[in-house]
């Protein structure tokens, strides 16, 4: 409401104020709802509904495809300083991709974690995909961790199960690419 009032004041009374659509998704269901809400605001409801159906079917098919696979524990590192785990929709993405997220909970902000937390979880897989970073920048962030003795003793590191992800392009933005993100996992 404050933002809408400020925009009306800024534009003056002689112009039609824009329609504001506030988005703050925390789960995949929220992302789907936001797609629907945007499609209504943009007067392309059928297109929005088709996209939601396509994504929902894709997630359902992916879950079916990985259902017989061994599930691995996955630590998705959303940030490196401070260390942060997966929040918002990321635990759902990891689950659809066949993993069980550690140190994160769907529908909640990404938690700050300590090395002791990561050691206690000792994940099978670590995905480094800091929010807003491409692969090259994520690789740079990873270098700051690899000299740490705590890092070297993790099962995922010892087993070569550490992956660098394009958080900016795939994981951190709430939209249609989240299906592709789950497929990548």
Describe every region a protein language model picked out.
Residues 79-80, 106-107, 123, 131-132:
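Histidine- and/or cysteine-centered catalytic micro-motif in compact active-site loops
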Residues 60-67, 95, 104-105, 113-116, ...:
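Small-molecule-sensing regulatory modules
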Residues 16, 68-70, 121-122, 158:
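Residue-level preference for short coil/turn positions at secondary-structure junctions
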Residues 20-22, 73-76, 101-104, 126-129, ...:
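Structural recognition of the beta-strand scaffold that forms the well-ordered cores
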Residues 1-41, 112-153:
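Acidic/His-rich segments in extracytoplasmic proteins that coordinate ligands and/or metal ions
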Residues 9-46, 82-96, 155-184:
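Extracytoplasmic metal-acquisition and chelation regions
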Residues 87-110, 130:
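His/Asp/Glu-enriched short active-site or ligand-binding loop at hydrolase and phosphoryl-transfer sites
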Residues 47-97, 170:
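Basic- and aromatic-lined ligand-binding clefts that recognize polyanionic substrates
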